[in-house]
């Protein structure tokens, strides 16, 4: 009797899973939530890769470490997940990082400092502050970052490019750099943003600034 009862429970569960999978599959398709070839990420960490196959009961995902995750369609309908299709079809992939400056190195620029920046930094050769405004070296550095990014073919100028100073903390003053890389392929995207920030970090001393470094 126990064996029969257990068998009935198992059959009901299989039937329930099949119905849920069928309904979820219809929802995924009707709402165009996911397709084979999409890059998806689950916040749970169960999957981060390319969708290979969608069936009644499973969504098969090849992760970037070449493992395979098998996810019930119902999971994608009932739980949040990130589909990167919009990024891959758009004109760029977002880069958003910060460079944290040492607050003690921020200062108003003297005419001599501005002359030196114009002479030593080609992109700043024609820089003129607004009339009546004495800029800080941090402000001039932000102008340089924007000009530098605008000079790079790998940066999509048609999408948002924003350089902003965030609230100062005990760890310094963050300068947030926000732009879109034209190249969306993971390896090249990482190389591009690394090269850009290598350059921006190396340029910090040119503006009489220092990057904040914590020390006991």
What are these regions (language model features)?
Residues 1-6, 10:
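Single conserved hydrophobic/aromatic residue that forms the stacking wall/gate
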Residues 2, 15, 193:
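Hydrophobic (often cysteine-bearing) scaffold residues that line and stabilize catalytic clefts
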Residues 14, 18-29:
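Membrane-spanning helices that line or support transport/gating and their immediate boundary helices
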Residues 22, 26, 57, 84, ...:
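Conserved, well-folded catalytic cores of nucleic-acid-processing
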Residues 27-142:
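Soluble accessory domains appended to multi-pass membrane transport proteins
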Residues 119-216:
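Long, non-transmembrane cytosolic or organellar matrix-exposed soluble domains/tails
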């Amino acid at each position: 009797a126990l064996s029969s009862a257990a068998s009935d429970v198992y059959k009901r569960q299989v039937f329930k899973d099949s119905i849920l999978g069928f309904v979820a599959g219809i929802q995924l398709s009707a709402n165009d939530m996911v397709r084979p070839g999409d890059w998806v990420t689950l916040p749970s960490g169960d999957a981060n890769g390319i969708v290979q196959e969608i069936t009644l009961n499973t969504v098969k995902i090849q992760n970037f470490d070449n493992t395979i995750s098998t996810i019930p369609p119902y999971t994608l309908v009932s739980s949040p997940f990130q589909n990167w299709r919009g990024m891959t079809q758009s004109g760029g992939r977002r880069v958003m990082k910060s460079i944290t400056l040492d607050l003690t190195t921020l200062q108003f620029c003297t005419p001599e400092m501005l002359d030196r920046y114009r002479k030593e930094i080609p992109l700043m050769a024609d820089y003129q502050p607004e009339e009546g405004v004495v800029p800080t070296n941090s402000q001039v550095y932000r102008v340089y970052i924007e000009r530098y990014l605008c000079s790079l073919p790998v940066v999509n100028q048609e999408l948002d490019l924003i350089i902003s100073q965030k609230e100062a903390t005990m760890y310094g003053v963050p300068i947030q750099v926000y732009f879109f890389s034209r190249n969306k392929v993971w390896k090249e995207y990482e190389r591009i943003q690394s090269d850009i920030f290598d350059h921006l970090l190396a340029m910090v001393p040119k503006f009489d600034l220092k990057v904040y470094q914590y020390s006991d």
